């Protein structure tokens, strides 16, 4: 007991010595020099809102970037709060520097305030020169543990061993570095050592940290704070027992440790195992000052080279290059002629090529020299033999007289491969270089550790500071994150052109988590009707048991086993099934010869059963309740002999049904038996069928203050969100995902009807905006993706991308909608199929839980059939509605406002040339009159002979005549209505390729078959003639509405016309026409037939007329102004739009093609002779 207490005291002492006293210090600059080597545990920055990266130096001003476990640089966010926002870290440093994370960050004139929590670290940096020491485990406080943590901070240029422990009972823990890669060998007593390795080019003489972390069933290896590898221990044991004596910086000399380095040469600043500082326990004579001379080096960038004069052999250097095929070393003569080339091929293998004899040799062994690690190169010539060594192995050689010629003529060595070079025998600081070269340091940035390529993509370092991903089929993008595969069958059917394919069923590859780690799944998508007659999309997952399984002979219960293979993992099964509201699977069990299902033998136990995806036994069949030992027939009491299953009756029978319990599905295995030589069973399992993907349920937001929210942490390399949404407002917030302090966020919103994706981080903002508007009330598919190199936005397949460098924020809380949130305008519309970084957001389930007012499940807006009248379209705003009356002759908020005019006899109303954009096949007019034998409208084509007339005959009946301009005349009459009965009648007529129809008051009165395509060419309209007297409204010519928008429709009129609603009940017709304007005003009205028409609504309530005296006075006051402006208005408003051509030469237009010229016959003032319009202008 006393011994255990001593061990605990020593352990506590070692921990206290390691940690030391901690305190907070602050610096008003971006650089903070500490008082010696300290352990930094917390960081915070105070100042204007910005973002900073962190670099630390242990010694020699060698600064390294601090990174997170996922490989991203650590980002410190400064705040204006007086309370520090701490970021927890754990590293050693003598100096800490921060610098803006953004290249063009806003400069803070005051400078940021850097706050650190530092702890005393009294252990000196120890230098090892092929020397080592031992530590007694009990003296260091090391005990057997189920969780272990080994941390080593080191720098070296060579391979070596850090820690060595091999216990007598077989437990092993060895940490070493070999060719720049850290290797850890461990065993917890199973006598089967496991290995884990990570890192690359760590023998570069810079400070690095390796951390081996064991947590019972998990082992991780991190390099410089980045998790690079992880595995699971083998065997049954999980506790690590150390040898009584552990070795630091070496190992004992024995014959059992082959493949393990014997010593270590370099420096170690920290070596801790389970918080025991083993470096502090080193002997005093080992504490040498860390002095590591830095060899001369330089970095060759693309298209650069270095020329090294030949002085002596061997010619030796170390290199770390980018995997680009081309020459590594070229031997030149004095005339710059190539003697020998050492080149790198596409597989990063070396070849030797002689320019003299054209001899080519491949390296043997074939060493990958472009893997990003440091390699040694040595060229030597001995007599008639030239040898090239890579990493100490002779891989290339050349023999014969050719070697003599090379040695005699050799003048220069040319290095041209892009990468880093260093040498202790060659002065690389003074070599002649061509191109972009960085001297004195290696600027090679490892971009493929950890692998940034997702979904099985391979990373290749393409430049000193860049990489490319070789993506697998179906994925693309910088990091192989982007995929065009649908998330579900519902999404696939929604895609244009797939609805018809789904009727028969189609094999589809779906990716549930989008660009996430989960692999795609092959399913069958089919549109079919369920048992209650509702059409829906079914997702069908097939297995490999295509035919029924037959079992016979003597078999014990469950003796015959068969595993059903679906081609997916258990994780994929869980994600697939759990995402649906309902899944089912057909099951059939046929028994013959007395075989039983649930009551076998004296124990009356099941003879056959199945296994679920969670490896549980399913002890029921068909629709029977889970684990009930019943079959489907027991539910309705139809089993034979009142048993629980038909196959428990002892007779030949069948139990079948559809298993509807998702927790039991799919059936992954069959355990069959209970048969004899005279009995048999036959089992059939159908495919898994699922319906109603929960995330595809639409959710309607009818209150812009409503919201749905949830928590999800984002700390990945790539952000993405995909959803389906429809809306009608031009300004809205769809989805936001923000940090806890609301200073950093992703925001997807609508601005001016366009989709906008915005990333805000550290006071910097990046936006991407769609090209088109989408506030049309229709579903649109949106996908937005962002990473450190840029982002792109895809709406309905139309993609827009932005290339820029920025940092993705760390966010936690997502919100859909909510006007009350900061910077949010709320959401009103329908949203579904939301996937946020591979996670399905089933908003319908959130809506059920939160019961938020203004949020409802389903696609149900405000619009109802009776809200908009007279053919107006209801535009659903989801928090309200508006009526679109633009395609009707009506107006007002509900399309009930009439636009009409009282037309006295002698008036003229016409459209001299209709805008071509308004021409169509359907037209409309409403009249109220007592006139007979009058024309309702006349129409013709400017450049054709076709005509159309509609009149009221002597009996008040409707009569129409048409001529197609070539052969056929049409004439019809309808006697069903008396159009002269002083009642408003609504007349509409439409033509098509094969029919012409006329309707009066909604009743079809005339139908003519034939070719009526000529009807679309009518572009000259005359309404009513001089005999007509009454009220007219609802005029529609194609897509134009002359009474509603006279300027747009190019309406001209003349006469004593009064505009207002029709019919006008406030005054009689006599009162409406009984006014005597000034003669000048009358002539002005006639002359300015194309002046602006202003339409006023006349109230239906009766009002007293304004006295004629007051009206006359007003008219006299305005007459002078009207006379002055009439000529200018006439000129500007009377000419139709277009281009006029003169017909004087007859080259452009033929006057005979028009029935009526645009300029009517006039009389010359000089000779009173008529001047014909055919000699003037025609519109072409």
From Swiss-Prot:
S-S bridge residues: 267-290, 448-459, 453-469, 471-480, 863-874, 868-883, 885-895
Phenotype on disruption: RNAi-mediated knockdown results in abherrent inx-3-positive gap junction formation along the adjoining membranes of EA and EP endodermal precursor cells at the 16-24 cell stage of embryogenesis, and in adult pharyngeal muscles. The inx-3-positive gap junctions are increased in number, are randomly positioned at irregular intervals on either the EA and EP cells and, although they are along the membrane, they are not on the membrane.
- Specify where the region named Disordered lies, as residue ranges: 1142-1180
Q: How does it sit in the membrane?
A: Single-pass type I membrane protein
For bias type Polar residues, the affected ranges are 1142-1152
Provide the residues annotated with a glycan attachment (glycosylation): 229, 302, 336, 355, 436, 522, 636, 933, 949, 978, 997, 1011, 1052
Where, in residue ranges, is this chain on the Extracellular side? 21-1108
Topology Cytoplasmic: residue spans: 1130-1180
The molecular function terms in GO held by this entry are: actin filament binding; calcium ion binding; gap junction channel activity
- Regions of biased composition (Low complexity) lie at 1161-1171
SUPFAM superfamilies on file = Concanavalin A-like lectins/glucanases (SSF49899)
Task: Please state every residue range assigned to the domain named Laminin G-like.
Answer: 124-290, 695-863
Q: Where is the EGF-like domain?
A: 444-481, 859-896
Tissue range of expression?
Highly expressed in pharyngeal g1 and g2 gland cells, pharyngeal muscle cells and the unilateral GABAergic RIS interneuron (at protein level). Expressed in pm5 pharyngeal muscle cells and the nerve ring.
- Which function does this protein serve? Required for gap junction formation, playing a role in anchoring the cytoskeletal component F-actin to the membrane of adjacent cells and thus facilitating the formation of gap junction channels in embryonic cells, muscle cells and neuronal cells. Plays a role in maintaining gap junction activity to promote pharyngeal muscle contraction.
Q: What is this protein called?
A: Neurexin like receptor 1
Q: From which source organism is this entry?
A: Caenorhabditis elegans
Upper lineage is: Eukaryota, Metazoa, Ecdysozoa, Nematoda, Chromadorea
């Amino acid at each position: 007991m006393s011994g255990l207490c001593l061990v605990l005291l020593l352990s506590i002492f070692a921990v206290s010595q390691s940690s030391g006293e901690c305190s907070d210090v602050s610096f008003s600059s971006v650089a903070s020099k500490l008082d010696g080597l300290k352990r930094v545990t917390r960081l915070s920055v105070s100042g204007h809102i910005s973002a900073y990266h962190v670099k630390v130096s242990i010694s020699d001003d060698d600064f390294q970037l601090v990174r997170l476990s996922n490989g991203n640089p650590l980002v410190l966010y400064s705040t204006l709060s007086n309370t520090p926002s701490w970021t927890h870290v754990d590293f050693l440093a003598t100096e800490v520097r921060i610098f803006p994370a953004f290249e063009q960050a806003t400069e803070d004139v005051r400078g940021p305030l850097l706050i650190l929590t530092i702890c005393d670290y009294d252990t000196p940096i120890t230098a090892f020169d092929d020397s080592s020491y031992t530590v007694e485990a009990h003296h260091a406080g090391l005990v057997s543990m189920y969780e272990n943590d080994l941390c080593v901070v080191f720098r070296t240029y060579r391979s070596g061993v850090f820690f060595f422990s091999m216990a007598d009972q077989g437990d092993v823990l060895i940490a070493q570095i070999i060719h720049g890669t850290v290797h850890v060998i461990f065993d917890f007593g199973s006598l089967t050592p496991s290995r884990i390795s990570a890192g690359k080019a760590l023998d570069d003489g810079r400070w690095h940290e390796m951390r081996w972390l064991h947590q019972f069933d998990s082992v991780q290896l991190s390099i410089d704070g980045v998790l690079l590898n992880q595995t699971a221990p083998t065997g049954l044991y999980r506790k690590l027992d150390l040898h009584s004596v552990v070795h630091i910086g070496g190992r004992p000399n024995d014959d059992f440790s082959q493949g393990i380095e014997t010593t270590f040469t370099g420096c170690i600043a920290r070596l801790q195992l389970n918080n025991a500082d083993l470096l502090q326990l080193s002997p005093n004579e080992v504490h040498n000052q860390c002095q590591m001379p830095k060899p001369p080096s330089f970095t060759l960038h693309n298209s650069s080279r270095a020329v090294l004069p030949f002085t002596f052999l061997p010619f030796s250097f170390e290199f770390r290059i980018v995997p680009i095929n081309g020459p590594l070393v070229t031997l030149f003569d004095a005339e710059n002629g190539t003697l020998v080339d050492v080149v790198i091929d596409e597989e990063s293998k070396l070849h030797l090529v002689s320019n003299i004899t054209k001899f080519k040799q491949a390296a043997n062994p074939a060493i990958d020299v472009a893997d990003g690690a440091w390699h040694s190169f040595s060229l030597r010539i001995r007599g008639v033999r030239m040898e090239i060594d890579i990493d100490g192995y002779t891989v290339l050689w050349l023999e014969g007289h050719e070697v003599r010629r090379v040695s005699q003529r050799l003048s220069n060595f040319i290095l041209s491969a892009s990468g880093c070079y260093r040498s202790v025998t060659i002065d690389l600081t003074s070599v002649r270089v061509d191109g972009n070269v960085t001297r004195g340091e290696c600027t090679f940035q490892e971009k493929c550790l950890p692998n940034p390529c997702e979904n099985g993509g391979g990373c290749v370092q393409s430049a000193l500071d860049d990489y490319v991903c070789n993506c697998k089929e179906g994925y693309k993008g910088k990091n192989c994150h982007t995929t065009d595969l649908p998330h579900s069958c519902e999404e696939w059917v929604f895609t244009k052109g797939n609805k018809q394919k789904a009727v028969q069923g189609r094999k589809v590859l779906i990716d549930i988590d989008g660009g996430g780690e989960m692999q795609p799944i092959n399913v069958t998508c089919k549109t079919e009707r369920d048992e209650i007659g509702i059409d829906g999309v079914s997702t069908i997952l097939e297995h490999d048991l295509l035919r029924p399984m037959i079992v016979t002979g003597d078999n014990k219960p469950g003796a015959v086993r068969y595993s059903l293979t679906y081609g997916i993992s258990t994780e994929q099964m869980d994600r697939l099934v759990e995402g649906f509201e309902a899944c089912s699977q057909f099951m059939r069990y046929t028994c013959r010869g007395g075989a039983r299902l649930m009551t076998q033998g004296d124990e009356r136990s099941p003879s056959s059963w199945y296994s679920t995806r969670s490896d549980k036994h399913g002890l029921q069949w068909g629709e029977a309740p889970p684990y009930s030992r019943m079959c489907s027939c027991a539910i309705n009491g139809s089993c034979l002999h009142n048993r629980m299953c038909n196959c428990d009756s002892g007779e030949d029978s069948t139990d079948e049904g559809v298993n509807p319990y998702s927790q039991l599905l799919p059936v992954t295995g069959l355990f069959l038996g209970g048969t004899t030589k005279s009995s048999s069973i036959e089992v059939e399992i159908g495919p898994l069928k699922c319906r109603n993907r929960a995330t595809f349920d639409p959710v309607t937001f009818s209150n812009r203050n409503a919201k749905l929210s949830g928590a999800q942490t984002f700390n990945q390399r790539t952000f993405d969100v995909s959803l389906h949404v429809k809306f009608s407002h031009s300004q809205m917030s769809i989805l936001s995902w923000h940090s806890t302090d609301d200073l950093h966020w992703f925001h997807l919103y609508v601005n001016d009807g366009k989709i906008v994706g915005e990333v805000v981080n550290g006071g910097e903002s990046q936006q991407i905006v769609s090209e088109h508007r989408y506030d049309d009330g229709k579903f649109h598919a949106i996908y937005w993706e962002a990473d450190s190199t840029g982002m792109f936005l895809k709406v309905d397949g139309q993609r827009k991308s932005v290339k820029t460098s920025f940092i993705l924020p760390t966010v936690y809380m997502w919100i859909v909608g909510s006007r009350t949130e900061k910077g949010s305008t709320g959401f009103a519309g329908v949203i579904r199929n939301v996937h946020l970084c591979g996670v399905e957001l089933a908003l319908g389930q959130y809506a059920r839980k939160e019961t938020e007012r203004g949020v409802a499940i389903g696609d149900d807006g405000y619009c109802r059939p009776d809200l908009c009248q007279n053919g107006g379209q209801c535009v659903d705003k989801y928090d309200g509605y508006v009526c679109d009356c633009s395609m009707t002759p009506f107006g007002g908020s509900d399309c009930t406002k009439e636009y009409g005019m009282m037309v006295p006899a002698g008036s003229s109303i016409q459209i001299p040339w209709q805008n071509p954009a308004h021409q169509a096949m359907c037209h409309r007019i409403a009249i109220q009159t007592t006139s007979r034998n009058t024309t309702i409208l006349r129409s013709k084509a400017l450049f054709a002979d076709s005509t159309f007339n509609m009149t009221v005959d002597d009996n008040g009946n409707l009569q129409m005549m048409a001529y197609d301009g070539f052969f056929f005349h049409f004439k019809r009459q309808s006697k069903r209505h008396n159009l002269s009965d002083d009642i408003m009648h609504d007349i509409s007529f439409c033509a098509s390729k094969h029919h012409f129809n006329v309707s009066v008051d909604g009743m079809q009165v005339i139908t003519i078959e034939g070719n009526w395509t000529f009807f679309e060419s009518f572009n000259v309209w005359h309404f009513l003639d001089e005999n007509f007297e009454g009220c007219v409204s609802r005029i529609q010519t194609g897509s134009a509405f002359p009474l509603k928008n006279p300027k747009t429709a190019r309406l001209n009129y003349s006469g004593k016309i009064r505009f207002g609603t029709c019919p006008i009940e406030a005054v009689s017709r006599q009162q409406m026409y009984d006014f005597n304007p000034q003669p000048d005003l009358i002539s002005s009205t006639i002359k300015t037939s194309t002046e602006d028409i202003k339409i006023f609504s006349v109230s239906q309530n009766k009002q007293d007329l304004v006295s004629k005296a007051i009206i006359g006075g007003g008219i006299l006051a305005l007459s002078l102004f009207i006379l002055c402006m009439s000529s200018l208005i006439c000129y500007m408003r009377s000419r139709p739009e277009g281009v006029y051509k003169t017909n004087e030469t007859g080259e452009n237009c033929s006057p005979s093609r028009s029935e009526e010229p645009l300029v009517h016959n006039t009389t010359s003032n000089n000779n009173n002779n008529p001047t014909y319009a055919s000699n003037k202008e025609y519109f072409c």
